[in-house]
Amino acid sequence: MAATLQFLVCLVVAICLLSGVTTTQPHAGQPMDSTSVGGGLQEPEAPEVMFELLWAGLELDVMGQLHIQDEELASTHPGRRLRLLLQHHVPSDLEGTEQWLQQLQDLRKGPPLSTWDFEHLLLTGLSCVYRLHAASEAEERGRWAQVFALLAQETLWDLCKGFCPQDRPPSLGSWASILDPFP
């Protein structure tokens, strides 16, 4: 399970780096934009900064909140920004995550996600990985794994907009076995 968690975290971090090379712009009607994020969050962090913060590791506390493990990094402006995003904009339960996923699926035929929404999507996926790892019951692990797989598919959909033939992203295919909580 630890190797799977490490692989999934590395996958999300790699996708975070990919988000830095996308050229998506905010669009009206998106689930979140820079005006709804709050005063100190005017634009997403550079991918290398986000990579450093995530590489330091996160921990899930007893209240279900994710925190940066490295206190020094957590005290920096980017660290405080990430903490704010994780606490106030990334769903902390299955129902909230499923609602966010439904909003993304409703937007699938539209333009690429804004930079804010793409970052939100990636952080929600990362949150799923930690919650999957912390889940104690098989049924809950299965639901978190399913939601993570769907978020990964939405990430591929968004990255593929305008590039993939017939607007169809590559399938998760063999990745599904990695995400299976019942090996």
From Swiss-Prot:
Its main location: secreted. It comes from the Eukaryota. Residues 1-23 form the signal peptide. GO terms for cellular component: extracellular region. The keyword Repeat does not apply. InterPro entries: FAM180. Keywords: Secreted, Signal. It is found in: Secreted. Pfam families: FAM180. Belongs to the FAM180 family. This is Protein FAM180B. It comes from Homo sapiens. The lineage of its organism: Eukaryota, Metazoa, Chordata, Craniata, Vertebrata.
